[in-house]
Amino acid sequence: MVPSGRKHSGKLAKPSVGDQAIRAYEFEQEDKKDLSGSEEDAIEEKTPTLEKQGKKRTSAAVEDMGGEVQNMLERFGADINKSLLAKRKRLEMYTKASLKTSNQKLENVWKIQQEQRQKLNQEYSQQFLTLFQQWDIDMQKAEEQEEKLANLFRQQQKVFQQSRIVQSQRLKTIRQLYEQFIKSMEDLEKNHENLLTGAQNELKKEMALLQKKIMMETVSCYSEL
């Protein structure tokens, strides 16, 4: 992986192979023009024979010059190719190393995150398990307590019903006893009235007899006198 944070603004870009070849060709053409111009000036001053010989020599020199330039361009191109291949290999090596390092870092990060997740899951899983176990225990206790309360309520309800039955019986007994008491009192009053009436009648009879006896004794006394 090639780092994207490097700055290239401070370095000048290297000319490409095509630009260098074009510059070499232009330089060759300028040399040809300079050489041909100087030869023509010299030939104009010489005889026609020397002019022909000078043209032959100039063309030969130009051909030699062109061959040297061609060789130089070929060598330059080969050097550029070698340099590009070397740079390409270095770039590939750097890229592979960078990818390997990045993969190792990512694997380490993933491994650490995985371990942290497992640790967190285990920690909270244990806490949740403990809480759920306690919850089950509390629910069992609540159900047992509810069952006890239900039984107690049924017992209390039964006791209350029995108490109501007993109270109803007691109240009925009290009512019956009260009625008996009232009846007994009435009977007693009637009996007392009858006894009193009888006593009064007896007393009246006795008083009448006594009065009669007294009258008879009084009459008897007066008779004897």
Swiss-Prot record:
Top-level division of the source organism's lineage: Eukaryota
Listed Basic residues bias regions: 1-11
Family affiliation: Belongs to the XLR/SYCP3 family.
Phosphoserine carried by residues: S36, S38
Chain intervals for the UniProt region annotation (Interaction with DNA): 52-57, 87-90
Region Important for oligomerization and fiber formation, residue ranges: 68-73
Record PTM: Phosphorylated.
Domain notes: Composed of a long central coiled coil domain. The N-terminal and C-terminal regions interact with DNA.
One Gene Ontology molecular-function label: DNA binding
Start-end of Basic and acidic residues biased regions: 44-53
PANTHER family from the UniProt entry: XLR/SCP3/FAM9 (PTHR19368), XLR_SYCP3_FAM9 DOMAIN-CONTAINING PROTEIN (PTHR19368:SF15)
Motif Nuclear localization signal per record, residues: 87-90
GO biological-process terms attached to the record: cell division; meiotic cell cycle; spermatid development
Chain intervals for the UniProt region annotation (Disordered): 1-59
Keyword field: Cell cycle, Cell division, Centromere, Chromosome, Coiled coil, DNA-binding, Meiosis, Nucleus, Phosphoprotein
Protein's UniProt name: Synaptonemal complex protein 3
Residues forming coiled coils: 65-218
Any Gene Ontology CC annotation: chromosome
Location (main, coarse): nucleus
Quaternary structure annotation from Swiss-Prot or TrEMBL: Component of the lateral elements of synaptonemal complexes. Homotetramer; the tetrameric helix bundles assemble end to end into long homopolimeric fibers that exhibit a transversal striation with a periodicity of about 20 nm (in vitro). Interacts with SYCP2. Forms a complex with EWSR1, PRDM9, REC8 and SYCP1; complex formation is dependent of phosphorylated form of REC8 and requires PRDM9 bound to hotspot DNA; EWSR1 joins PRDM9 with the chromosomal axis through REC8.
